[in-house]
Amino acid sequence: MNTLRYFDFGAARPVLLLIARIAVVLIFIIFGFPKMMGFDGTVQYMASLGAPMPMLAAIIAVVMEVPAAILIVLGFFTRPLAVLFIFYTLGTAVIGHHYWDMTGDAVGPNMINFWKNVSIAGAFLLLAITGPGAISLDRR
């Protein structure tokens, strides 16, 4: 039982950390590219959410979801970027998925997405603590 309890993944650890980095940011890259390509629509969407300073919010969203996410995959500035992603992910949860202010059919999906964002922030906290692993530009 102790073997399973203290299993450290041995030689597979660097590969598994790479897979984890990709998995954590994949959602940002997938949804960030359309935000970047349709930037005017992103600004309008931010305004519709009631985001403060919609233009700035759209710029932050695009920068975090595309280049910053790609840097996480590459394992470059991983720990500081992971900390930024914690704040970004929690901020988007509060701004974009404020289910407590909603009614009807909007409550359920937004509650799910709010708590998914909280879980993703937890994954970024783990990444900030563990670092990117050996298969990274940071190599730590």
Curated annotation (Swiss-Prot):
GO terms for cellular component: plasma membrane. The keyword Nuclease does not apply. The keyword Transmembrane applies. InterPro entries: DoxX, DoxX-like_oxidoreductase. It comes from Escherichia coli (strain K12). This is Inner membrane protein YphA. It is found in: Cell inner membrane. It is a multi-pass membrane protein. The lineage of its organism: Bacteria, Pseudomonadati, Pseudomonadota, Gammaproteobacteria, Enterobacterales. Belongs to the DoxX family. The chain crosses the membrane at residues 14-34, 57-77, 80-100, 117-137. Residues 35-56, 101-116 are periplasmic. Keywords: Cell inner membrane, Cell membrane, Membrane, Transmembrane, Transmembrane helix. Residues 1-13, 78-79, 138-140 are cytoplasmic. The gene is yphA.
